[in-house]
Amino acid sequence: MIKVIKFIFIIYYLLFFQTAYAIEKIKIGLLVPMTGANKEIGNSIIKAVGLAIKDIDSDLIEIYPKDTATKANQTLKSAFELSEMGVKVIIGPVFHESLTYLDEMENL
């Protein structure tokens, strides 16, 4: 009888108290102007996204802002950096001229 109780206890413990899975964090990249004439717009977007994440109240979302400087070549460089970091979701860029070289990015 004691063996049966131990067995039931072990099964109960394994079913309800073990979390054997890993939760992967969601990485979101921001391509915004953080330098140059439009840095105020970029800073506002970073703050707005930060407030939205704070409202969601989740530790599973990480934000990675990168500077575009409102230049196409800097935007491409920042996009490659985000890709190397494993970021799959990107918000931005803000300005149309920053999109010029982004078609070279296949996995974003």
Language model region names:
Residues I2-F9, L14, A20-L108:
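Extracytosolic ligand-binding ectodomains
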